[in-house]
Amino acid sequence: MSSKVRSLCEAAALVKDGDHLGLSGFAVARNAIAFSHELIRQGRRDLTISQAIVGMDADILVGAGCVKHLVYGGGSLDRFGLVEHINRAYEQKRIVAESYSSLAVCFRYLAGALGVPFMPIKSLLGSDILKRLYEIAPDSVREMDC
């Protein structure tokens, strides 16, 4: 069996412009900083980033102009402040930002891991988050009767 181990450069080279990446971490903990820097160095563009709590890695990718679409459940740089690049890019309409709750993003990951198209949750019902998602990404959310 061949090894799955890759150098950082080789791993980043597998990512193509327009790909959708799921990042882990939380604010400033366990972020993929070196990987993000390598994506920037290799000049990736038009990426979609999903992250339950956006952190420094997503912020630097947005700041470098690599991200077109962000799917996230809030975030900050914890004691270091706000995610300035993300906030600025959103205000200037340089990125599309789908803001969910962190739980909703995690359930999206769970649905993908289970190989199902969606995972029903009730936590967004009656929230402003759901109202905004209907405006920004109407194909990403649905209400259903059970």
Ranges and model annotations:
Residues 1-146:
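Conserved alpha/beta enzyme-core scaffold
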